[in-house]
Amino acid sequence: MPRYFLELSYKGTNYSGFQKQENANTIQAEVEKAFLVLQGQSITLIGSSRTDAGVHALQNYFHFDYEELHPQFLYKMNAILPEDIALKKINILPANAHSRFDALSRRYEYRIYRKKNPFLQNFALYYPFKLDIQLMEEAATIIGTKNYFFPFCKTNTQAKNFNCTMYKSQWVTKEDSLMYIIEANRFLRGMVRLLTASMLQVGRKKISIEEFNRIFDANEKCGFSIPSHGLFLTHVNFPNAYFN
C-alpha cells in the first residue's frame, strides 16, 4: 500500500495544537475529517512535529497509508479544509518512510515586535521593554551548548527523555523587531517559549547570565513563559534527496 507524505502550513490561533485530542479542535482532526469527506474512508495521520496550542507552522508533515487518492486530491482537500490550514504538497514514499522518525531536525522561530503594530498582533509578541540584546545573544549561545532541557518543558509533559541535540540558537534583530531561531533534533512541550521567555528576562536584567545558566542544572521547572502566538515551526528537515 502506498505511503503518502503531506506537507502543510497552518495558522494555529484557533486550534488546541497539532495532535488529535478528545473534545478539542486540532490540525490533525481537521485534516482527517476533510479526508473522510473526500475519500469516504477514515485514516489516522502520523505527524512530524506536534506543535502546541496556538502555535503556527510554515511547514509540517503528516504521513498515511492509502490505496488510491482522488485525482485532484490536493485541490479538493484544500477546498474542504478551513482557510487557516493549507496542504502544499503530496509525495509517495517507500512503505518504511516515517514523517516523525526520519526527520533530522525541526526549526522554530519566536517573533517579537517592539513598536506597536495592529497587523502583527496575532503573529508576534508585542514587547516594548528595553532589552540588552548582547546579553540575550550570550544566553542563546549558552543554549547551543546544552543538551538536557528538563527545566524548560511544561509540568504536565509525558516525556521521559529530556535530551535534545542543538543545531542552532541565535537572535536576529532588526530596527523594530527581533526573532529567536532555534533548531534541534527534537523539542519538549513548551520548550521554545520557556527558553525565549527566560532570555527576555536576561535582556531586561531581571536575571543574570549566571542565573540563567544555573536554570539548566536545577531540578525544577523554569518559571517564565510567553504566549504561543509568536511561535512558528518553519522547517522540518529530512535527509538529502529524501523526497526524490
Sequence positions of predicted segments:
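Structured-RNA-binding interfaces characteristic of tRNA pseudouridine synthases
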Residues: 1-244
